[in-house]
């Protein structure tokens, strides 16, 4: 079921959009899914991946603190990064971004981090960030977003204490769980 047609998911799922090419830009801070903008995003220029990752983590941590201050329970936050290339960020910045991902996953806000690689992305580099790497083989983004939507509906119905995530056995055709080389 689509996240927009599910009453519980529609109330619980919030989305933020961060782009990173030569510059990092917050297209949308966290908003309920029903108010999410649908921007046209194009791959241009360089790929400041470290800057994009760190900005996304910053937004997640800020939102987590807001929930904690309000005493509101919440599911583990997700970052789902879509990339078509190799990072142009300096090595030390990528190493720091990698450390930030691992810290927030293990000790911080419980962050779940996935990568969707398209075209000529850096598989090995993505596995330094996370074990959760999926590959889009036929550029069918609609199927991927439908799959994500179904996963969010499932997670929205679980207890906040359950470790729910993407269901790899339900992936659409043309999307595979990429194995590390």
Name each region found by the language model:
Residues 130-178:
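C-terminal helix of von Willebrand factor
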């Amino acid at each position: 079921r689509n996240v927009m047609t599910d009453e519980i998911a529609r109330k619980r799922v919030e989305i933020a959009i961060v782009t990173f090419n030569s510059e990092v830009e917050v297209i949308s801070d966290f908003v309920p899914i029903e108010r999410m903008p649908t921007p046209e995003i194009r791959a241009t220029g360089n790929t400041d991946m470290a800057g994009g990752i760190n900005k996304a983590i910053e937004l997640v941590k800020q939102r987590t603190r807001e929930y904690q201050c309000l005493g509101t329970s919440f599911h583990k936050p997700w970052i789902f990064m879509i990339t078509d290339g190799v990072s142009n960020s300096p090595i030390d910045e990528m190493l720091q971004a990698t450390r930030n991902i691992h810290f927030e996953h293990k000790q911080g806000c419980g962050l779940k981090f996935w990568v969707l690689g398209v075209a000529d992305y850096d598989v090995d580099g993505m596995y330094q960030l996370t074990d959760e790497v999926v590959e889009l083989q036929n550029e069918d983004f609609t199927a991927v977003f439908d799959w994500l939507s179904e996963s969010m509906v499932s997670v929205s119905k679980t207890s906040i204490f359950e470790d729910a995530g993407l269901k790899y056995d339900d992936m659409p055709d043309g999307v595979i769980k990429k194995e590390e080389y």
